[in-house]
Amino acid sequence: TCSYCKIVGTIRLQKYLYGSDHQLGFKQISSCAHAIYVVRKTVEYYVSNDSTVNICTLDISKAFDKFNNHCLLLKLMKRRLPVNFVVLFQRWLCNVFIKVRWGSCLSKLFRLFSGVRQGGILSPVFFCIYIDDLINKISHLDTGCFIRGFFSAIWLYADDIVLLSATVSGLQHMINACVQELDYLDLSVNILKSRCMRVGRRFKSIGTRVVINGSPIDWCDELGYIGMIFKSSTVFM
């Protein structure tokens, strides 16, 4: 299996194995600093034009453990990946067997039907492809933040999602689309770890609830995103 990954990794498949520019994780030339930078610049652009930005971070429950291999294969086929590689990936992904050790006891061998391999050479690429339609769906809503026509309403760092909108209604629209698309992917949002916050002149004016399946997301004075803490204020802090 490892040999397969190394061989495939040397073949030029960028035409098929790519992710959105709005996914800043798993890339050699990007880091957490880039993710923070694009959020900061988007918020500062709107605040400088006397707007208030609504920020929402969504936490995906066990995103890597619930990774649906068959869904990934369908996405690869939609990209017209050559059939020999589809078959190769199908055999590689769907024939994973493990044992569990508990103390001195070892379980019987059993098959895994979901999950992406931690540390696998192609695992980051597969996850980017798997989540790519979520970004595409949000980008086609024509809502959220734009900077002179450039779409800047959703950014991901691996499985960490941040949504940016100048209106609460626009934010809710994007959240609904995210929840729907994640449901298609056999994933769900952990509402207890998801947060909303406002930055701008009217940061204290919160009149509308933001919900996921009827349950409200908390509006907070502070919001954590990939190791950084943002504060609700008149300016981005």
Language model features: what each stretch is:
Residues 4, 214-237:
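Basic, alpha-helical interaction scaffolds
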Residues 1-129:
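Conserved pre-catalytic core of RNA-dependent polymerases
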Residues 62-79, 154-185, 199-202, 231-237:
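Catalytic palm subdomain of template-directed nucleic-acid polymerases
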Residues 48-50, 153-156, 221-222:
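Short, flexible turn/loop "capping" segments at secondary-structure junctions
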